[in-house]
A protein has these predicted regions:
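Alpha-helical transmembrane segments in inner-membrane proteins
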Residues: 1-326
Length: 326
């Protein structure tokens, strides 16, 4: 099979898998619905108010969010692996998700303690600030160390420090804050609303579009900084954009679904193996499709395995051997 045919075949397989999982997620759950009932609800011809509400207000926004956030997390992992030239770099390993988790935890505890409501925009801003702070520490360490293995250790250490501070914050939180924070910190796509979908789409889609625009400079950067400069890439500006985009994508995922590990590390490697190519122009779309399908599958298993009881995403991913947060 030629490389072009392999790419087309791989994209078709990923798109078909994503479409199948999306469809199954709409009619499979604690309340079983037939495909006919799902189609009727989606086209506005549903007669049963209960089934229409389950589809349009619960399962559909949840599935859309799983697609958006799965694509964002996988793309963030690939951007970080490209930037650090390290195959195990990812939002969790580099401490970005832990920094975002700490910032969101602080906002949730402080706001709930004073009886204030936390909007999606506030959580995203807090998560982005925490992610950028953690990334700043990693970049500061990168200037002082030469070996990538030491840099990864620095990222892991920052992650553990952020997790320790998060636990310290929780120790002084009110009971209601602890419950909300615990449920969120396990990682889940439950409780998503159309308002969440709109906010996430406003963040994720432009960030992914910007990442696609950087595909050509990324290909040059993979050949080394010297080569990238020789072909006209502003490495400093490019690096800043890469850091901002990866942090923003990881922060958005953490703000809405909590800290989710493994996806940002594993999916880019699986996609590259499937496509037989490491070119960013080909890998980025594959990462988005693969990450979306992977998160849909995990969410489907989490809410269906022991229905009506629902598992967290982390409960499933922690069974996989991968670098992860505490």
């Amino acid at each position: 099979m030629t490389s072009r045919k392999r790419l087309v075949f791989s994209y078709c397989c990923l798109a078909l898998l994503l479409a199948m999982l999306f469809a199954v997620s709409l009619f499979w759950g604690s309340v079983a619905l037939t495909p006919q009932a799902v189609l009727a609800a989606l086209t506005g011809r549903g007669q049963d108010a209960l089934s229409v509400g389950i589809i349009t207000q619960l399962r559909l926004p949840r599935a859309v969010m799983a697609v958006l956030l799965g694509a964002a997390l996988s793309a963030a992992g690939y951007l970080l692996q490209t930037f650090f030239a390290n195959p195990i770099a990812g939002p969790f390993v580099m401490g970005i998700s832990s920094g975002a988790k700490l910032a969101v935890a602080l906002v949730m505890v402080l706001f709930l303690n004073y009886g204030l409501l936390t909007s999606s925009a506030v959580l995203i801003l807090a998560a982005f600030a925490g992610a950028m702070a953690a990334m700043a520490f990693v970049l500061a360490a990168a200037r002082r160390v030469q070996r990538m293995s030491i840099l990864v250790i620095c990222g892991v250490m920052i992650g553990y420090i952020c997790s320790a501070i998060t636990e310290f914050v929780v120790a002084f939180a009110q009971d209601s804050s602890i419950v909300n924070l615990h449920n969120w910190s396990q990682g889940s796509f439950s409780g998503m609303t159309w308002g969440n979908v709109r906010t996430a789409a406003l963040v994720v889609l432009p960030a992914l579009a910007a990442a696609f625009c950087l595909a050509k400079p990324m290909a040059a950067y993979q050949m080394g900084e010297a080569y990238a400069r020789s072909v006209g890439v502003d490495v400093r500006r490019f690096s800043r954009l890469l850091v901002l985009l990866s942090s923003l994508l990881a922060a958005c995922v953490t703000a809405f679904a909590g800290p989710i590990s493994f996806v940002g590390i594993a999916v880019p490697h699986l996609v590259k193996q499937l496509l037989g190519s490491a070119r960013p122009l080909y890998v980025l779309p594959g990462c988005c499709l693969g990450g979306a399908a992977f998160c849909l599958l995990c969410d489907l298993i989490a809410r269906s395995l022991f229905a009506p009881m629902e598992l967290s995403i982390s409960c499933l991913l922690y069974t996989s051997p991968s670098p992860r947060d505490s």
